[in-house]
Amino acid sequence: MSEDKIVSHAKVGIIGGGIMGVSLLYHLAKEGWKDLVLIEKGELTSGSTWHAAGQCPQMMGGYNLAKIHRESNNLYKKLEKETEQPTGFHECGSLRIAYKKEDLDWFKYVKGILDNIGAPSEIISTNEIKKVHPFIKLDGIIGAFHTPDDGHTDPTSTTNAMAKGARNYGAK
């Protein structure tokens, strides 16, 4: 992350300056790991991160991935204060629409996972959908799954904020 000199030795070398590599660097540095270096052939986010959608959902079908998403959304909110650099995170919530009973069954399964990790969510009726999204056309809709903490971020800004945080913790 520094062009001042080429590092000849490191205990941990992370290859790739996208959001995944920089996130790993940030988290290791924050946990107190020393002698870390990030290796990137171009600029940070010059690979696939720069054109990623930046969606931050928490509705995942598995416990571990849902927990990672929850922690990520919480991090993006804190990271701006920690680094004084914008992440571009916007917590706007989301609705997943149910057109059949099987959709509602899936929502119940996912709600159990989200309840377990402390992520707010609710299965809502068509009347409640209108309160969240007053302009939606309800034809064929039987319910929805509302996750108010979902959002989206600017992947490049988020990566750069994590890079700054990693440097603040001593990473190179």
Regions found by a protein language model. Name each.
Residues D4-V7, K30, F89:
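Short, flexible hinge/linker loops that cap or flank conserved catalytic cores
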Residues L25, A29, G165-R167:
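Gly/Ala-rich phosphate-binding loop of Rossmann-like dinucleotide-binding domains
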Residues A29-T49:
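Glycine-rich FAD pyrophosphate-binding loop
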Residues F145-K172:
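Helical element adjacent to the flavin cofactor pocket in flavoenzyme catalytic cores
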